[in-house]
């Protein structure tokens, strides 16, 4: 029997690594693109035919005509936001109804989930996690508590199910003493979104994806965020509520682990983080501001300033290990084109004075130990081959590959699809 392959594409830092552009570069090789976790709290920014799009729930392969895109069971879906996102794409001439399939087992983000998100965050006072306020955490909480609503529930007796869940949420919100909300308008748009979802293929995605594989077709699994936001392996409690690592593709799509082939890990040539939580290489000076300005480091969904810092190789090696990464893709290399000195963290000094190259249980308070590299001071944005790379940039890449024990196969030198160097 001819069997298709499953490859996984995921970020390796705290999210925002540039997955959208890379998916668009890689998708021509695949028949199906499937999103396996997360929700509208994370956005992939893509440029297609001169127009910029931010995809929050829809897989990035939607711009490749004729390819099936699947929203897997591991995703949490906000019907109103999904509808707005899909209609924006349809206005631009992208027909989604036949090419976008939605898992019956994907959980629904209710309007009251967003209110719960705000209420829980407000109750934490100074210990806020830095949630995006999209209702992601409360939705996954309901999922684990076995009280959630799923896409498959909209097909029969939905209003009754919805009202029961809403009443339970309102009790929780009242218990938290939170009164600053009115869901009337949001609820109206949300219900319109429910009717809109019914126009799509609502499928048993685990069966569909395995039938696709048995037919010999290839699947690219697309993750959101990054492993340092993984609920198990990230900088807990400053994490998201899902498994963002490679194993999440198996859980979030119903694929056996023996199906996984290549695991593409995406990293920036530096590092960023949005929201609260430890960030060992964070820069609080003019260098950090310069990286933010040159890299346009603002959240695709929230617009929040991203915290910027040097590349953290201790953290990256950990992410490569827990994901089984086979190839690296380095984004935004051009952002560092004008820096006289580039740094990379190669070890941590712990609070007891010892040094380690293993990511510790507690990241707060660790001190980065850097290796310095001479900057290349060359505009690489028009390069078409790795043969044009300056010696200083080659030295930086060579060191990263040696330290991380993983090849860097693709180097991005600008936002456009053409500004992508595939290395030999």
What is each residue range found by the language model?
Residues 1-424:
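Non-transmembrane, aqueous-exposed alpha-helical and coiled segments at domain scale
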